[in-house]
Amino acid sequence: MSESVRTNTSIWSKGMLSVIVAQFLSAFGDNALLFATLALLKAQFYPDWSQPVLQMVFVGAYILFAPFVGQIADSFAKGRVMMVANGLKLAGAAGICLGVNPFVGYTLVGIGAAAYSPAKYGILGELTTGDKLVKANGLMEASTIAAILLGSVAGGVLADWHVIAALVACALAYAGAVAANLFIPKLVAARPGQSWRLSAMTRSFFSACVVLWRNGETRFSLVGTGLFWGAGVTLRFLLVLWVPVALGITDNATPTYLNAMVAVGIVVGAGAAAKLVTLETVSRCMPAGILIGVVVAIFSLQHALLPAYALLLLIGMLGGFFVVPLNALLQERGKKSVGAGNAIAVQNLGENSAMLLMLGLYSLAVLVGVPAVAIGIGFGVLFALAIAALWIWQRRQASY
């Protein structure tokens, strides 16, 4: 490791700021590209059920490459891994701009995102240490939330003006992320010299899966975070379908504004969880998870914009309070058992598998003609029941 990295572990170091800027631009591009590509599908008269399929090809890339991306992140300098991953995202977005099938281009973006995730979190521990690492994670999450808010809104607003302009803006964001990655110090690979045989890599990954699943706390965390993020991405697409039906608004911007309210709420809920929940009292977050489903069902019955905003803000607050303690639990327990990189890769597999399942069920419901309001109510009720079942299961496991 270079001397500059050894001595400068400040969260305001050049390397750390480069990581944060790259993360913001990359996440901005991800969120803007989703809504810009959805607008492109609408403009090209794709059926409604194809919208969640777009996200399914994205998360499918995460699942397919899950056994390998953790080792890739640990075998090379993580800053360079992030740069190559953002380059793949840039190629996918540029391809969509140039007329490549949007599903093909978005799959390439998904491959880049899969490779990017373990590297972006793993590099924080190489650039700083101790209490500063907690603050660095906070900066990373803050930049991500800001990118979700601004990227989602920018994608929808620009798409209402000009779809191709929105897609070009996404490509430029990814290009900026690649440029920012160039300023990250070239760190020594964490675990060089590992076997690149597919069978060995796959065995190593699934061995980590088994270790985490056999531990009651990490299993509880994996299921909880998987349910949450699966529900979260499904809600995004439900809003795109629900807004014109319930509110009579047909633009591309309104669903992005509503999604932004959820992101704002997550920030508030995450702050509350940091103050009120510890690793020893993680079960305090479970009532919030049940209430997410209840509020989603109530939200689905609304016909005015103001209560819709308020309820989505509440959903976000409940979500932040629910998921942050579960993430912390998995990171802490996983670091001690299989390593942080493997724990993140396994969590990504679980979350994206849940997304794929929920999006598949949602696509099927849309395909057979279930009304958007009915989908929302059923979705909320099922989510509340699933979290309640998880809570009961966790309490029984703890009593043994």
UniProtKB/Swiss-Prot annotation:
The keyword Lyase does not apply. InterPro entries: LysoPLipid__transptr_LplT, MFS, MFS_trans_sf. It is found in: Cell inner membrane. One of its GO terms (molecular function) is lysophospholipid:sodium symporter activity. Pfam families: MFS_1. Disulfide bonds: none annotated. Keywords: Cell inner membrane, Cell membrane, Lipid transport, Membrane, Transmembrane, Transmembrane helix, Transport. The chain crosses the membrane at residues 19-39, 53-73, 91-111, 139-159, 164-184, 195-213, 227-247, 257-277, 281-301, 304-324, 352-372, 373-393. It is a multi-pass membrane protein. GO terms for cellular component: plasma membrane. Belongs to the major facilitator superfamily. LplT (TC 2.A.1.42) family. Catalyzes the facilitated diffusion of 2-acyl-glycero-3-phosphoethanolamine (2-acyl-GPE) into the cell. This is Lysophospholipid transporter LplT. The lineage of its organism: Bacteria, Pseudomonadati, Pseudomonadota, Gammaproteobacteria, Enterobacterales. The gene is lplT.
